[in-house]
């Protein structure tokens, strides 16, 4: 515990919050090119093959982003748009690819929460 005199000499430094999505550089979304599309396994206690892509962004950052929804058409050199948002059971995955934008197709036969998956309204 500092004394009053110590606090006068050197005041308390404010806590600085660390940026959760540094690669976006304060932008809502960023465009990038897939350099590798692959599956990975989540940490315990979950079990699955989660679809992820390594994306090189327009600002030079290279990040791992999650591909949401069932089925996708992404491959190497696909141009994608990413947003922030981590995947809790995949360490190091702090971004999501936006479905239905640029080279990413929307999810087929999606009926609920369609706007999140780039799906058109069914007839």
Swiss-Prot record:
Recorded GO MF terms: rRNA binding; structural constituent of ribosome; tRNA binding
GO terms under biological process: translation
Ribonucleoprotein in keyword set: yes
Family matches, as InterPro entries: NA-bd_OB-fold (IPR012340), Ribosomal_uS12 (IPR006032), Ribosomal_uS12_bac (IPR005679)
Pfam families to which the protein is assigned, alphabetical: Ribosom_S12_S23 (PF00164)
Alphabetical list of PROSITE patterns matching this protein: RIBOSOMAL_S12
Extent of the signal sequence: none
Keyword vocabulary terms for this entry: Methylation, Ribonucleoprotein, Ribosomal protein, RNA-binding, rRNA-binding, tRNA-binding
CDD domains, A to Z: Ribosomal_S12
GO cellular component labels: small ribosomal subunit
Residue numbers of 3-methylthioaspartic acid PTMs: 89
PANTHER family registered for this protein in UniProt: 30S RIBOSOMAL PROTEIN S12 FAMILY MEMBER
Subunit field text: Part of the 30S ribosomal subunit. Contacts proteins S8 and S17. May interact with IF1 in the 30S initiation complex.
Similarity field: Belongs to the universal ribosomal protein uS12 family.
Main function: With S4 and S5 plays an important role in translational accuracy. Interacts with and stabilizes bases of the 16S rRNA that are involved in tRNA selection in the A site and with the mRNA backbone. Located at the interface of the 30S and 50S subunits, it traverses the body of the 30S subunit contacting proteins on the other side and probably holding the rRNA structure together. The combined cluster of proteins S8, S12 and S17 appears to hold together the shoulder and platform of the 30S subunit.
HAMAP family per the UniProt record, alphabetical: Ribosomal_uS12_B
Official protein name in the record: Small ribosomal subunit protein uS12
Annotated organism of origin: Rhodospirillum centenum (strain ATCC 51521 / SW)
Lineage start: Bacteria, Pseudomonadati, Pseudomonadota, Alphaproteobacteria, Rhodospirillales
Gene: rpsL
């Amino acid at each position: 515990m500092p004394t009053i005199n110590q606090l006068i000499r050197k005041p308390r430094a404010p806590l600085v919050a660390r940026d959760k999505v540094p690669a976006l550089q304060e932008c809502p979304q960023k465009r990038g090119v897939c350099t590798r599309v692959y599956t990975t396994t989540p940490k315990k206690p979950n079990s699955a093959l989660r679809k992820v892509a390594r994306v090189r962004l327009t600002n030079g950052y290279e990040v791992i982003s999650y591909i949401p929804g069932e089925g996708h058409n992404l491959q190497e050199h696909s141009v994608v748009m990413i947003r922030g948002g981590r995947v809790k059971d995949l360490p190091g995955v702090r971004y999501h690819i936006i479905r239905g934008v640029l080279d990413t197709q929307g999810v087929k036969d999606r009926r609920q929460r369609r706007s999140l998956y780039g799906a058109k309204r069914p007839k």
